[in-house]
Amino acid sequence: MAAATAVLLMAGCSDRPGIDALVPVSAPLAEGAREQVILVASTRERDPRPGVFFNGERSAQLNFAKIDLSVPPSHRPGEIEWPKNGLGNPATDMVVREAIYRDTQGEFLRDLKSELARRPAGKRNVFIFVHGYNTMFSEALYRLAQMATDSDAPAVPVLFTWASRATTEGYVYDNNSATAARDQLEETIRLAFSSGADQVSILAHSMGNWLTVEALRQIRISGKTLPANKIGNIILAAPDIDVDVFKTQLRRFGKPPKPFVVVISRDDKALGFSDFLAGKKPRLGEYANDTELVELGAVVVDMTDVKALDSFNHGKFAQLAEMAPQLQGTIARAGGTATSNTVQLQGVRITGLDQARAAQPAGPALPAATQPAPAQ
């Protein structure tokens, strides 16, 4: 127990953004910087402190926001250039340009439709990101900005952020917060589908996968299902879900019409600790039986052999952003002349391409993201 606790506490010692990470910067946009507009749906409480915006306490209602950010010209794939010493510098840091609360669902939907209209016809897609445990609002927001920039996908980025207290000892609180947010995530997903988007994709990380799969399960059993032709990629990255629970969830689903993309790494130390807390039951994000996951209806993206950007090997899928076109192309070609069920791509092993063949045509380009080292 002492060793496991030490692992968790070391995760919490990594650098994190300051309390003022979201203070808007009015300095001119740096030459070569990229702008990102992120729409937010949140079960967090609003926070009046400058630079915080949302805290880790639970809200009784779903809150909305629209946030404009800029990404510096010196940005490196997979990295977040945090603002330093108070206000950031747009030439070197990711910074918030403008942050606005939205008071109603209608305002959020209006923003979403407006952003979709700025995209080319046929590429008016939505990409929803659901973060994991031990995550500040600012961490989730900047990570989505990194993801949207690195993947270079035209999809409108939407952050669904639930009430994590962003502390290493808050695992149980965070787990309960994720569970409590199921209805609100379902609401957000349905809003995205009602926006007129061509397709909607979802990326969940770590504990956010439990929330996402539960919300999708609710949608499935409600009888008010989503239009299959608008479902893009459902990406489960480093999922902190008990494998037996996942099997039960998918039995209720039945085999999905389009396979889940499960991103795993068998050397994930954060999920190893979660195993310990769960009575040494394996987590989906480190599961060793690819064949069983494929039979359940998944394409498995195994990053075990990829060198991680974080010391806990929990955020490896950050590297997928830069190689998103190649990865999507590999999956898409499975519907054409590809004959192998398993391929290797830059150290990433992809299994279950037979699932992708059955589900053609492919959805929008697969984006990727990661959490900072302390997030699980």
Ranges and model annotations:
Residues 128-132, 205:
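The conserved beta1-alpha1 loop
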Residues 185, 204-208, 212:
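Gly/Ala-rich beta-loop-alpha elbow adjacent to hydrolase catalytic centers
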Residues 9-12:
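C-terminal motif of bacterial Sec signal peptides marking the signal peptidase cleavage site
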Residues 135-140:
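Short substrate-entry loop that stabilizes the transition state in hydrolases
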Residues 104, 108:
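Walker A/P-loop-proximal flanking segment of P-loop NTPase domains
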Residues 125:
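Alpha/beta-hydrolase fold active-site loops
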Residues 1-2:
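Bacterial N-terminal signal peptides that target proteins for export
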Residues 14, 19-100, 110-116, 120, ...:
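Lipolytic serine-hydrolase domain surface
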